[in-house]
Amino acid sequence: MLPKNYDPNEIEPKWQKFWLDEKIYKYELDEKKPSYAIDTPPPFTSGTLHLGHVLSHTWIDIIARYKRMTGYNVLFPQGFDNHGLPTELKVEKEFGISKDQPEKFLQKCIEWTWQAIEAMRNQFIRIGYSADWDLEYHTMDDWYKAAVQKSLIEFYKKGMLYQAEHPVYWCPRCRTSLAKAEVGYVEEDGFLYYIKLPLADGSGHVPIATTRPELMPACVAVFVHPEDERYKHVVGKKVKLPIFEREVPVLADEDVDPSFGTGAVYNCTYGDEQDVVWQKRYNLPVIIAINEDGTMNENAGPYAGLKTEEARKKIAEDLEKMGLLYKKEKIRHRVLRHTERSSCMAPIELLPKKQWFIKVKDFTDEIVKVAEQINWYPPDMFLRLKDWAESMDWDWVISRQRVFGTPIPFWVCDNGEIILPNEEDLPVDPRFEKPPRKCSDGSEPKPVTDVLDCWVDSSITPLIITKWHEAIKGDEEGKKWFEHNFPTALRPQGTDIIRTWAFYTIFRTWVLTGEKPWHDILINGMVAGPDGRKMSKSYGNVVAPDEVIPKYGADALRLWTALAPPGEDHPFKWETVDYNYRFLQKVWNIYRFAERHLENFDPASAPEELEPLDRWILSRLHRLIKFATEEMEKYRFNLLTRELITFVWHEVADDYIEMIKYRLYGDDEESKLKAKAALYELLYNVMLLLAPFVPHITEELYQNLFRERIGAKSVHLLEWPKYSEARIDEEAEKLGELAREIVGAMRRYKNSHGLSLNAKLKHVAIYTTDSYEVLKTIEKDIAGTMNIEKLEIIKGEPELEERIIEIKPNFKTVGPRYGKLVPKITAYLKENAEEVAKALKESGKIEFEVDGQKVELTKDDIVLRKAVFSEGEEVETAVVGDAVILFF
């Protein structure tokens, strides 16, 4: 029996343990069953899940549960992305271990990461996540690193991997290069400096505007727009840089924005991506003025050794003294920062460095073509990837100057020769292992000490989960697994990593297999705080899952995620979770009520012919099943979730169950059996529809109400409800809707008179013309539901008479004005009630004389109460469509 109260903290852990112990979600390769492989996002092992993880991974879980119910063999692994700067920073800060002790440092990174994995896995389980944990993977596992290194060797063999000096995004705080996807612009307050640069021929100045005066020592040109009339006369001339006494050319290029600042900018190597484009486009020299640690170098002359911020201030002061800085304007502008990890957020420099690159810029058209073969949900998310591909200025820098990461598996000779490892030795770590052979000239190759960008690790996840790495070795089981599951069915992920995880996965998978990685990609938005702003500690609006679940349970939180629209940001609202919790309480109470009535019910005894309201609710149910299936196939959970809640709370609980209670408690055994049959079919299917969304409460309901009859070990091993056209009954639906409206009007009458819903009504008559036959069909349902002693359904229109039953002055307004005349005014109103009412209706006032004195009263001065009478009895009325309800 279901306990009296719904307690998610009691039932949820119980069923989570049951699912794990019974291996309910274990995947077994079965070539006879259709496969549905999910390329799940491996979260970075920070040690805790945030609400963004809860949203995205609950979506994934909803899909996995639904697909199992529709007959698919669901491959649902979960991985963890282990490598990354935050772990290194934590080990340095919390454990005091330096990267100068690489082996000890690595060991501590691994130890800490295992602790983080354990904590995050437990959080996944606590939200009801139905992954097969036997398939869990970690990017720091040796077999995983071996697969990554094998993929890298394949790229090298295809001529797509190279080492070169090139401007890269450099984090002075982390002392490492970054991929474009790891950096981003942040809106900040700053200054725009207006500087006059003297023309070398002495004929005047070119005014430029810049936010970074400290880059002047690295200036190699000044650019203006070719159509800008202000500067046409200086194009081709040179300006002389103040302080540094160098001459640089003035060039024209259409990329210049004439409306920004003065319309003239200087090109420094390198202030931003545009500087890189111009330097390469015009083959300009490269001058570097900033060190790796963010200080100025010897090219900065007298400013060498200063931090960039200090040099900016000092150069601006010196230019002002020279009369060349003529304006300093406060602005709101975008600053490039290390945005991928909030623990850093340092300003980014563009520095030329020798790094390892994967060729990608030349393949963007192919990447877009492959992406077009994938079904994007929502479709406009494809455009984000396309725009990103078209905006790429250079290749993918994959090397990182870190310790904890997948090693780049190469040794390099002085002559440029690259020594590859023996593939049977993978994974290798050149930092600690000797090369497999010497250079061709007999010299010792030098190890590559860099590690890989973590996106190199995670961009082969669809290959990892389908055992590509085993299949290419000729492993028979691996080949079967790969052939059956690749391309995977689905990639679910967030909008924020379209340009990284989605882009690089499509690219790498296409290069390695010639195929798309997935058939579908589902994009979720970001989670905003309760105030609608991005969740941030600085805003004080961060809500952790561990704050929500103890109070409301995982199922209520899961419903909040299901209400998120695809591709759009979704604010966390406490009131939404509270509403969801109350909905689940309502569900609990529905099934507790039904449990008593269905205890000895045998579904095999269900009669074929049901009563009208039974046919109505089952018709509505099957319309919902059809809609639910369509929405689930399109991954549109938000609309479906709203429909489910509305249907269960209102049509099932408020209407249908209330309208069959009299039958369940009554003496008509045949009618009672029909009600039980409909209730059983209804609640069984509602449970199945809810199961992917709220797996814990539905498991509890199944085990208590249905398992003995059905036999399956878990609700999540049952089939998704099948839509039946035979159950659609349009006439019954019209009838049911009319019953809802009639009963609703009667409930409102009871409520307005302070009557309980089960209070008896002595006499009610319903007059109707068009709905007479329908109402006669449900006459006993209306009478039984509303406890009406005498209910009449009468064809035709009622004869109603409106009478004034009370008319008197409003003593508060009339008394002060007319004093002793009030009694006579009262008498006049009663004697002339109809005339007074007519005058008030037409003009809003009435004038008459009392004892020779003129009296003028408005609507506010008169209390007028009318009543409706039918056959001499006072009645109250309500109108529903063409039906008029009379309450005697």
From Swiss-Prot:
Keywords: Aminoacyl-tRNA synthetase, ATP-binding, Cytoplasm, Ligase, Nucleotide-binding, Protein biosynthesis. Transmembrane segments: none annotated. SUPFAM superfamilies: Anticodon-binding domain of a subclass of class I aminoacyl-tRNA synthetases, Nucleotidylyl transferase, ValRS/IleRS/LeuRS editing domain. GO terms for biological process: valyl-tRNA aminoacylation. InterPro entries: aa-tRNA-synth_I_CS, aa-tRNA-synth_Ia, Anticodon_Ia_Val, M/V/L/I-tRNA-synth_anticd-bd, Rossmann-like_a/b/a_fold, tRNAsynth_Ia_anticodon-bd, Val/Leu/Ile-tRNA-synth_edit, Valine-tRNA_ligase_type_2. A motif ('HIGH' region) lies at residues 43-53. A motif ('KMSKS' region) lies at residues 534-538. GO terms for molecular function: aminoacyl-tRNA deacylase activity; ATP binding; valine-tRNA ligase activity. It is found in: Cytoplasm. It holds the Pfam family Anticodon_1. It comes from the Archaea. PROSITE patterns: AA_TRNA_LIGASE_I (PS00178). It catalyses: tRNA(Val) + L-valine + ATP = L-valyl-tRNA(Val) + AMP + diphosphate. One of its GO terms (cellular component) is cytosol. Signal peptide: none annotated. Belongs to the class-I aminoacyl-tRNA synthetase family. ValS type 2 subfamily. Catalyzes the attachment of valine to tRNA(Val). As ValRS can inadvertently accommodate and process structurally similar amino acids such as threonine, to avoid such errors, it has a 'posttransfer' editing activity that hydrolyzes mischarged Thr-tRNA(Val) in a tRNA-dependent manner. This is Valine--tRNA ligase.
